[in-house]
């Protein structure tokens, strides 16, 4: 439900992952990506504990099935990585605007706080 609401508000697809799989999906590619195992590049990216925005060059973006990763915000619970909020897109999609990136980071922070409780 959270991914659905966030996707509607942001106007783009939203994925939520744990450390191994996509656990929630909304928007384009939802059925293809739900329950998919995380690619090793995404696992390494989340372990950096930083907000990620894809490079402008589509050839350098991380692939998620038939989609591309445009933004990733790690979910940090008590200092440990528990997953992330991901914004997928196509190779032709523009990079997300600053307010969309901030919303993904806020969503990850909210989920982290909720998991800490």
Task: Identify what each model region corresponds to.
Residues 1-9, 37-44, 48-52, 84, ...:
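Juxtadomain coupling helices with adjacent low-complexity linkers
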Residues 75-85:
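Short hydrophobic/glycine-rich mini-motifs in sensory/regulatory modules
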Residues 64-76:
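A short beta-strand signature within small-molecule sensing/ligand-binding domains used
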Residues 63, 67, 96-99:
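Short amphipathic alpha-helical interaction segments
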Residues 1-64:
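Structured interaction and signal-relay segments at domain junctions
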């Amino acid at each position: 439900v959270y991914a659905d609401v966030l996707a509607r508000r942001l106007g783009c697809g939203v994925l939520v992952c744990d450390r191994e799989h996509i656990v929630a999906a909304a928007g384009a590619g939802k059925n293809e990506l739900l329950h998919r195992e995380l690619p090793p590049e995404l696992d390494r990216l989340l372990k950096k504990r930083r907000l990620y925005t894809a490079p402008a060059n589509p050839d350098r973006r991380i692939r998620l099935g038939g989609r591309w990763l445009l933004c990733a915000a790690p979910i940090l619970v008590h200092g440990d990585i528990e997953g992330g909020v991901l914004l997928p897109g196509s190779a032709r999609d523009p990079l997300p605007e600053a307010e969309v990136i901030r919303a993904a980071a806020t969503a990850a922070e909210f989920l982290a706080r909720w998991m800490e409780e």
